[in-house]
Amino acid sequence: MMSNNMPRHFLDLTELPTSELRNMLSAAVAMKAKRKANADGEKPLAGKTLAMIFDKPSTRTRVSFDVGMRQLGGESIMLTGAEMQLGRGETIADTARVLSRFVDIIMIRILNHEALLELAANATVPVINGLTRKSHPCQVMADVMTFEEHRGPIKGRTIAWTGDDNNVLASFAHAAQRFEFKLNIATPPQLSPSKALRDWIKASGAAITIGTDPEEAVRGADCVVTDTWVSMGDKDGEHRHNLLKPYQVNAKLMSLAHKDAIFMHCLPAHRGEEVTDEVIDGPQSVVFDEAENRLHAQKGILAWCLGAVA
C-alpha cells in the first residue's frame, strides 16, 4: 500500500488491490446514476486541474477525460507530444517535476510504457495511464463496469478474447486476476501473447487459457471481446489481416457463446474485419454503453486519485 504522502497513481491494474479498484467502480456507478437522474450537483474536484498529455491525438480519450473532469467540477488542459517534445528536449523527469507545480493530476497517453513509469516516478501529483503500448487499464475498468451493468457480478464468469495480442488484452489478463473471472484467449500462433505476458499469467495464478482456436475460446463464454486488427501506424496490415480472418466475430462465432452473452469492442471498429455489422449492431452488442462508460469509469479513477473516493 502507498503511504499517505505518496500520490495515488493509476498505472496498471496489477499495481492496486482489488478493494481499491472496486472503490473506483462503485464511485463510477454512483456518479453515472446521479448524472442520469440530474442529481450530480456535487463537484468533488472543484478547483482541481488535469493535464492531459498526448503522444498522438485521441478523440475518445481526450473527450472522456475532459468532460469527466468538468462534470466533477475541475478543468483540464491538453498538451501534445509535438508541443512538449517529451523526452527530446526537457527530460521526462523534469517535465514531471514542473507539471507537478502547476496541476493537480496528470493523464498521459503515450506508446512508450517506460516513459509513463518515469513520469510517475518523478511526479508529486497522481499520474493516470491513459494508454501505452503495454496496457490500457482505463478501458478495461470501463469494460468490467459495462459487463456488471448488463450481466451482474463478473466474478466466476467467462470472458473470451479473439483476435490480436495487444495492450487491451494485457489489461484484460490483469483484470482476470484482480476481479476473479476466467479469460479464454485465442490468437493466431504468430500473434500470441508476448513472453512477458505469458510469464505474468503463469505466475499470477489467474484462470486464463491461451490457445489458437476462436471457437474453443468462445464456446459457453458470457462475453466475447475483440479489438482492431491493425493499429495506427502498423506497416504489416495485409499480412495481419490474412492471419486474423479466422478470428472475426460474426454470428456463427457468437452462436457458440452463452445464449445471453454480450459483445464488447473498445472502438473504433473496422466493420467487416474484426467484427461484422450483424454482431456490432445486434442485440448482444453493448459497445456504445461500453464507450459511454469510459467517461464514468474514468471519473471514478480521477476521484480516487485525488482522494475524493476512499
Swiss-Prot record:
HAMAP family: OTCase. It catalyses: carbamoyl phosphate + L-ornithine = L-citrulline + phosphate + H(+). Signal peptide: none annotated. Belongs to the aspartate/ornithine carbamoyltransferase superfamily. OTCase family. It comes from Rhodopseudomonas palustris (strain ATCC BAA-98 / CGA009). Pfam families: OTCace, OTCace_N. The keyword Cytoplasm applies. One of its GO terms (molecular function) is amino acid binding. The gene is argF. Carbamoyl phosphate binds at S58, T59, R60, T61, Q85, R109, H136, P137, C138, Q139, C266, L267, R294. This is Ornithine carbamoyltransferase. Keywords: Amino-acid biosynthesis, Arginine biosynthesis, Cytoplasm, Transferase. InterPro entries: Asp/Orn_carbamoyltranf_P-bd (IPR006132), Asp/Orn_carbamoylTrfase (IPR006130), Asp/Orn_carbamoylTrfase_sf (IPR036901), Asp_carbamoyltransf_Asp/Orn-bd (IPR006131), Orn/put_carbamltrans (IPR002292), OTCase_ArgI (IPR024904). It is found in: Cytoplasm. PANTHER family: ORNITHINE CARBAMOYLTRANSFERASE, MITOCHONDRIAL, ORNITHINE TRANSCARBAMYLASE, MITOCHONDRIAL. One of its GO terms (biological process) is L-arginine biosynthetic process.
